Curated annotation (Swiss-Prot):
Organism: Scheffersomyces stipitis (strain ATCC 58785 / CBS 6054 / NBRC 10063 / NRRL Y-11545) (Yeast)
Matching InterPro entries: IGPD_sf, ImidazoleglycerolP_deHydtase, ImidazoleglycerP_deHydtase_CS, Ribosomal_Su5_D2-typ_SF
Descriptive protein name: Imidazoleglycerol-phosphate dehydratase
Reactions that this protein is recorded to catalyse: D-erythro-1-(imidazol-4-yl)glycerol 3-phosphate = 3-(imidazol-4-yl)-2-oxopropyl phosphate + H2O
One Pfam family in the UniProt entry: IGPD
Keywords from the named record: Amino-acid biosynthesis, Histidine biosynthesis, Lyase
Molecular functions (GO terms): imidazoleglycerol-phosphate dehydratase activity
Pathway: Amino-acid biosynthesis; L-histidine biosynthesis; L-histidine from 5-phospho-alpha-D-ribose 1-diphosphate: step 6/9
The keyword Metal-binding belongs to this UniProt entry's keyword annotation: no
Length: 222
């Protein structure tokens, strides 16, 4: 069964469409929310298509696009993110709502937590930075994120929003996750290594455990 989902979420602050395939492969949306908007070259920086993955992230915030591109690439996903947000106010609503909606898409695409490992962990270095992530597909939304970022912003994304995006994803996905940057002095590297570590952990957690069982002593995870 294909583990895919397409979610549309409209509020007074953001209009979002996300399509996700947890196992990669071809992915498309029926109709883009950008149909009346001219696409320029700046929108192509987080776009990649191969025989195994389709990734196109257009949140309106360049560094957020970069992080979600890295997450999708190393998790093995195909991912399309479209967002029109109230960036004339600030980046908060856009970043938060994209995280929430991606989490909802993840939960829907995964379906019943059955026949998968449930737990996953990963480390990812980026030059001097090293991050660790541990994930539990628990249906218990909780996130501990410690990245130690010191800059006010990276590109147009506030550094305070970077852990909040991850927390919002965990809430929407109903998963427990711990993400820590263990060392590093470049905030770009610290953040990117964290998203890559999370990708490695998620990829393990959603992989087959060789059974058709629910991986819980409760017998259910919903």
């Amino acid at each position: 069964m294909a583990r895919t989902a397409t979610i549309k979420r409209d509020t007074n602050e953001t209009k979002i469409q996300i399509a996700l395939s947890l196992d990669g492969g071809f992915l498309a949306v029926e109709e883009s929310i950008f149909k009346k908007r001219k696409i320029d070259d700046d929108d192509e920086h987080a776009k990649q298509a191969t025989s195994s993955q389709v990734i196109n992230v257009q949140s309106g915030i360049g560094f957020l696009d970069h992080m979600l591109h890295a997450l999708a690439k190393h998790a093995g996903w195909s991912l399309i993110v479209e967002c029109i947000g109230d960036l004339h106010i600030d980046d908060h609503h856009t970043a938060e709502d994209v995280g929430i909606t991606l989490g909802i898409a993840f939960k829907q695409a995964l379906g019943q937590v059955k026949g998968v490992k449930r737990f996953g962990s990963g480390f990812a270095p980026l030059d001097e930075a090293l991050s660790r992530a541990v994930v539990d597909l628990s249906n218990r939304p909780f996130a501990v994120v410690e990245l130690g970022l010191k800059r006010e912003k990276i590109g147009d994304l506030s550094c305070e929003m970077i852990p909040h995006v991850l927390e919002s994803f965990a809430q929407g996905a109903h998963i427990t996750m711990h993400v820590d940057c263990l060392r590093g002095f470049n905030d770009h590297h610290r953040a990117e290594s964290a998203f890559k570590a999370l990708a490695v952990a998620i990829r393990e957690a959603i992989s087959s455990n060789g059974t058709n069982d629910v991986p819980s002593t409760k017998g259910v995870l919903f």
